[in-house]
Swiss-Prot record:
Component of the large ribosomal subunit. InterPro entries: Ribosomal_eL29. The keyword Transcription does not apply. One of its GO terms (biological process) is cytoplasmic translation. Its main location: cytoplasm. This is Large ribosomal subunit protein eL29. Keywords: Acetylation, Cytoplasm, Methylation, Phosphoprotein, Repeat, Ribonucleoprotein, Ribosomal protein. The keyword DNA damage does not apply.
Length: 157
């Protein structure tokens, strides 16, 4: 038969939480550092025996709250309040992923291409612009060769 352990962990957390896990005494009244400890101790007893001294507890609480408010006011410096601008969710990445998708993005890509085609200047307008540019250019400058043709004259060294 297996030997039982001396220390058990069974039911421990329930035991700890039954009375509430308490902070160390030094950290208990962090915001009430300016208040004397005797007063705080009395306040705790008044809380425990609230049937005996309900009025006392209420006065103590009021005193403690005012003392706490003063302590907090002394500790915290007022900050400038900045207006909060609501930030919307960025859907940029979702949109890009949708466009890049092989099936889903087919129509989206078609629409984008159509929009780009519509934005491009028309062929007639291009021809008019080119004729105006050629007429305005002086005759000394030779006309540009077509894209595929090579230049016949080379600079001699």
């Amino acid at each position: 038969m297996a030997k039982s352990k001396n220390h058990t962990t069974h039911n421990q957390s329930r035991k700890w939480h039954r009375n509430g896990i308490k902070k160390p005494r030094s950290q208990r009244y962090e915001s009430l550092k300016g208040v004397d400890p005797k007063f705080l101790r009395n306040m705790r007893f008044a809380k425990k025996h609230n049937k005996k001294g309900l009025r006392k507890m209420q006065t103590n609480n009021a005193k403690a709250m005012s003392a706490r408010a003063e302590a907090v006011k002394a500790l915290v410096k007022p900050k400038e309040v900045k207006p909060k601008i609501p930030k919307g969710v960025s859907r940029k990445l979702d949109r890009l992923a949708y466009i890049a998708h092989p099936k889903l993005g087919k129509r989206a890509r078609a629409r984008i291409a159509k929009g780009l085609r519509l934005c491009r200047p028309k062929a007639k307008a291009k021809a008019k612009d080119q004729t105006k540019a050629q007429a305005a250019a002086p005759a000394s400058i030779p006309a540009q060769a077509p894209k595929g043709a090579q230049a016949t004259t080379k600079a001699t060294e």
